Amino acid sequence: TSKPTLSASEKAAIGSPNLESISVDAACSGNPGKMEYRGVLTHNKKQLFLKGPYPKGTNNIGEFLALVHGIALLKSKNKESIPIYSDSRTAMSWVKQKKCKTNLHFDASNKDLLDLIKRAENWLKENSFKNPILKWETKAWGEIPADFGRK
C-alpha cells in the first residue's frame, strides 16, 4: 500500500520541525516482542541514549519510556526549554496522564520492564517539566530522526 502524500499547501501549513530539539522512538519485533528505545539530537541524529532490548515489550511502552527518559535527561541538564518530538500520540497521552496504560501481561520474563514503567510513572508524579512535547509529523517530514530504520 502506498502512503498518502501531502500537497505542498498541506506541508506548508504544518511547517518545519524545530531542529533544536531531541527526538525519541521505539522499535519492537513482535507484539509483544523484543523492544528497545532511544533518543537523538534532531538536527544530526547523534544518539543521546539507547535502552534495551527488553523481552516481551510493546512499541507503545517503548515510546512512553523513551519520552520520559528524554524529559528526565533534559531536566537533569537544565535544558527545560528544548522540545521533544515523538511520533506516538499514545505515548504523548500516557505522559500527560502520568500513566502507562498498557494491557500487557507481565511475568518473570519481563519484570524488569514493569519496574522501569513504575519508575517512569513515579518520576512523572514527583517531577514537573516545561519541555514542549511535540508530535513529529511523519507525513510531512519523513521518519522521525530517532527511527530505527527497520520497517
PLM region descriptions:
Residues 61-68, 72, 118:
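A broad detector of short, well-ordered amphipathic alpha-helices
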Residues 48-49, 66-68, 110-111:
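Short, charged/polar low-complexity linear motifs in solvent-exposed/disordered segments
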Residues 56-60, 64, 106, 110-113:
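Flexible, glycine- and charge-enriched loops at secondary-structure boundaries
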Residues 29-31, 72-150:
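RNase H catalytic domain
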Residues 1-3:
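N-terminal accessory interaction module
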Residues 8-61, 72-73, 148:
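RNase H-like nuclease fold core
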